Amino acid sequence: MRKLNAVIFAVLAVVFILPVVATVLLSFEHGLQGYSDLLFDCFVFYPMFWNSVIYAVVITLVQLVVIIPCAFGFSQARFRGKGALFVFYIVLMMMPLQVTILPNYIGLRDMGLIDHQLGIILPMVFSPFGVVVMHQYMKNIDNSVIEATRLETNSIIRVMITSVIPQLRVCIFAVVLFVFADCWNMVEQPMLFLKNEELKTLSVFITNAQNYTGEVLFPAAVMFLIPVLLLYLFFNDSLEKGLTLGDLS
């Protein structure tokens, strides 16, 4: 059985890794000329790359500010309807983007945020995924530390900052990786909510493949992969620990 599982996982690994390897190899089809054209002659690359960085970093940081208090409330607070509200969060997490993107567009249009950076950031701030994951992880934290801090202060914010967040470092790293990757890979939002090319992201650059030659496109795809791969390499241990502890709960 173990050998069968090993074979299955090996096949799946090859299926997932093969497109990445093919992209890297194709990026060197013309030697370094494609990278040279991309980095020195393609003037839209740098603005779109930094737009992707800014959107992903800002959304990730703001999501953490929202996620941690929400997850703390679900795990520690007692109020009527908490279970139903948490189920609602899970339903929202499973809801596909295509269901919510039109209401988001209408709301942003009415607020005058179409073709504005906030039109990308605001709809991504309130993500139920991080709340659900961090709530599961909070079931494993040491409540004795929280109770000891509550004896010293009545401030729930201080309790959260001094007693809860230090125990969430592993989970925070895991959530950061997932949220950053999700924001980095977003395509529909910048394509629909932004008209100004100077505000669009690198994912849009790659999606509009018909506008560029293969010499530039494949190197751009490799550059697009690098930030998420680096994050995974740095936070791999924290990601595995976070997923394991969340699964055990």
Q: Across the structure, where does each feature detected by a protein language model lie?
A:
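A structural signal for multi-pass alpha-helical bundles of membrane permease subunits
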Residues: R2-S249
